[in-house]
């Protein structure tokens, strides 16, 4: 028993050594550059999937192994660890830092929920819409962590209002007050059931913005242990948790900067196919927004039906008097919004810079008309989305966070201390350096596959798949990444599959975008398990869900997601990128139109 206990304690160390030794015959026996690169790929992939080593540490292995095998010089490998992607990420994180520092994200979320009304079904849609919108610009993780406490307060107020109605009715019929059902009517989060807000870390994750921290409302007493007054209250909490987790992931699909998988794909694609000018912020948004919108609406309908039933008459009734629960819900949202006070100077500046950044991204090269990048026609392709992100990001360090002068009691106007909207220390606390290293490792691995000839070898071996219909190849690859991403991190999954799917597309004479776009989108469909992605873990940590709840709900959302992506890649996305024709910017192949 003591021996097994030692194995259990040192299992990670033993697994790392075991993996390295078991795979070692591959380069020793074959002794080709392809085999040596395959050994590196298998070792890195195994450690990424099992997380035997931290993801970022594993991502550094190509910088060690590729030079040792003579595949690439160390200087060339090192250059893969900092690319245009990293500059784009820095600019986006500057924006995210200012948004969260000045609470603009909370104001946007509450305002959007106030706009949709207090009907339970529409309220849920409001939370999903606001969460998805924020997730377009912030990380999925921080969006879920920010919206959940707001949703918790709203749902708690609904449950309290229901209990109040029950107590009032019982008092009316019995002629006496039922003290057991008295509740605290305050909507202040510190007064409801003597709850207090704590920060609860979710272990084992490093994602879009680094460490995960979710604001979890925990009971001070044993109230949460006795769980819920009614089954409906429990179901409502489940529904709210799942809506926020799933919508934060769905919203990230919409923009290149919305989630790390999109960024990894964009950088890989632009590096492998530098002559392609068709993929940018605007073109990505144009094809992904309809897909994300459809997935969001269908997921909302699915979750409503699964947990509450779908009563159209109740949902779309007009001119009816609001119930006590709906009034209470509206009140708590209103009071939470009022706590923010009037919009401040810092929020206005952040919002203006945010809008300018989005407009510059869209107008750089919209496709249907010349963009502002045409002003630099002498240097085509020099200005990218990272140029815009860095320009706006720099302004956050320059623009003062408050007016630079003040009036003294004597009426004299004097200058006082200058401080920018964000500081470098604040930026560093938000910057996901682990993701930056992880992405760099993926690029280094992809470069190694190209230099060694492994990518070409894989493509040749997969070329028999060309006999299958293109839609079937896309479906198979989409289902593969959707399944794998449930047990592996999204960035690791997409980094692993891109160097495999690109040569496959080239080998079977298919437009690479035809396979890579759906595979990239499906990599984000990690809806089944709490450990599948950080937003799932955040909402699961509130204690309202069981694993089986997430599996049942997530299975439906997964099916919806894959179906919508397949619909999009066969309809509106086709003419945008001429997907049925093998492009001139791909490696030399005879231009053929797919049957």
Swiss-Prot record:
Glycans are attached at residues 174, 207, 591. It is found in: Apical cell membrane. Highly expressed in kidney; not detectable in the other tissues tested. One of its GO terms (molecular function) is sodium:sulfate symporter activity. It is a multi-pass membrane protein. Keywords: Cell membrane, Glycoprotein, Ion transport, Membrane, Sodium, Sodium transport, Sulfate transport, Symport, Transmembrane, Transmembrane helix, Transport. The keyword Cell membrane applies. GO terms for biological process: sodium ion transport; sulfate transmembrane transport. Inhibited by thiosulfate, selenate, molybdate, tungstate, citrate and succinate. The chain crosses the membrane at residues 13-33, 41-61, 77-97, 108-128, 131-151, 239-259, 290-310, 348-368, 381-401, 464-484, 491-511, 512-532, 554-574. It comes from the Eukaryota. It catalyses: sulfate(out) + 3 Na(+)(out) = sulfate(in) + 3 Na(+)(in); selenate(out) + 3 Na(+)(out) = selenate(in) + 3 Na(+)(in); thiosulfate(out) + 3 Na(+)(out) = thiosulfate(in) + 3 Na(+)(in). GO terms for cellular component: apical plasma membrane; plasma membrane. InterPro entries: Na/sul_symport_CS, SLC13A/DASS. Belongs to the SLC13A/DASS transporter (TC 2.A.47) family. NADC subfamily. PANTHER family: SOLUTE CARRIER FAMILY 13 MEMBER, SOLUTE CARRIER FAMILY 13 MEMBER 1. Sodium:sulfate symporter that mediates sulfate reabsorption in the kidney and small intestine. Can also mediate the transport of selenate and thiosulfate. This is Solute carrier family 13 member 1. It comes from Homo sapiens.
């Amino acid at each position: 028993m003591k021996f097994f206990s030692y194995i259990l304690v040192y299992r990670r160390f033993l697994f790392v050594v075991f993996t390295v030794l078991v795979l070692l015959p591959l380069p020793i026996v074959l002794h080709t550059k392809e085999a040596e690169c395959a050994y590196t790929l298998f070792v890195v992939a195994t450690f990424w999937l099992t997380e035997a080593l931290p993801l970022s540490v594993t991502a550094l292995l190509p910088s060690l192994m590729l030079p040792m095998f003579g595949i690439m010089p160390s200087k060339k490998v090192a250059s893969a660890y900092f690319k245009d992607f990293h500059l784009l990420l820095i600019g986006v994180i500057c924006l995210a830092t200012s948004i969260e520092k000045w609470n603009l994200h909370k104001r946007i979320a509450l305002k959007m929920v106030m706009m949709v009304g207090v009907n339970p079904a529409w309220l849920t849609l409001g939370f999903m819409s606001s969460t998805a919108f924020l997730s377009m610009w912030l990380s999925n993780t921080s969006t879920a962590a920010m919206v959940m406490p707001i949703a918790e307060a709203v749902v708690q107020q609904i449950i309290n209002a229901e209990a109040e109605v029950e107590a009032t009715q019982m008092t009316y019929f019995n002629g006496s007050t039922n003290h057991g059902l008295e509740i605290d009517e305050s909507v202040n989060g510190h007064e409801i059931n003597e709850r207090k807000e704590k920060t609860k870390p979710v272990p084992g994750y490093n994602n879009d913005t680094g460490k995960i921290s979710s604001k979890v409302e925990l009971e001070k007493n044993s109230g949460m242990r006795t769980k819920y007054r009614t089954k409906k209250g429990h179901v409502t909490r489940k529904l709210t948790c799942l809506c926020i987790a799933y919508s934060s992931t769905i919203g990230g699909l919409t923009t290149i900067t919305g989630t790390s998988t999109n960024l990894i794909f964009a950088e890989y694609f632009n590096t492998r196919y530098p002559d392609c000018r068709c993929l940018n912020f605007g073109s990505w948004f144009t094809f992904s927004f309809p897909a994300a919108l459809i997935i969001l609406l269908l997921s909302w309908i699915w979750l409503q039906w699964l947990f509450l039933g779908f009563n159209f008459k109740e949902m779309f009734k007009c001119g009816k008097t609001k119930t006590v629960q709906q009034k209470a819900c509206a009140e708590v949202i209103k009071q939470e919004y009022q706590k923010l006070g009037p919009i401040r100077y810092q929020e206005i500046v952040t919002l203006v810079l945010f809008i300018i950044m989005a407009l510059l991204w869209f107008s750089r090269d919209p496709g249907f008309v010349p963009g502002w990048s045409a002003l630099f026609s002498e240097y085509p392709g020099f200005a990218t989305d990272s140029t815009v992100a860095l320009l706006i990001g720099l302004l956050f360090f320059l623009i003062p966070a408050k007016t630079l002068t003040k009036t003294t009691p004597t009426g004299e106007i004097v200058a006082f201390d200058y401080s920018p909207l964000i500081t470098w220390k604040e930026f560093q606390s938000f910057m996901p350096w682990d993701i930056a290293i992880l992405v760099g490792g993926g690029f280094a691995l992809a470069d190694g596959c190209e230099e060694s000839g492994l990518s070409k070898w894989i493509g040749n071996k997969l070329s028999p798949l060309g006999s299958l219909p293109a839609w079937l190849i896309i479906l198979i690859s989409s289902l593969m990444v959707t399944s794998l991403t449930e047990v592996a991190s999204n960035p690791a999954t997409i980094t692993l599959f891109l160097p495999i799917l690109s040569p496959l597309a080239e080998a079977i004479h298919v437009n690479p975008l035809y396979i890579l776009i759906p595979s990239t989108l499906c990599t984000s469909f990690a809806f089944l398990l709490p450990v599948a992605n950080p937003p799932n873990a955040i909402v699961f940590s509130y204690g309202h869900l069981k694993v089986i709840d997430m599996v049942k709900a997530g299975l439906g959302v997964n099916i919806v997601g894959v179906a919508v992506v397949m619909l999009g890649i066969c309809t509106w996305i086709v003419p945008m990128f001429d997907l049925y024709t093998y492009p001139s910017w791909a490696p030399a192949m005879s231009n053929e139109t797919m049957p």
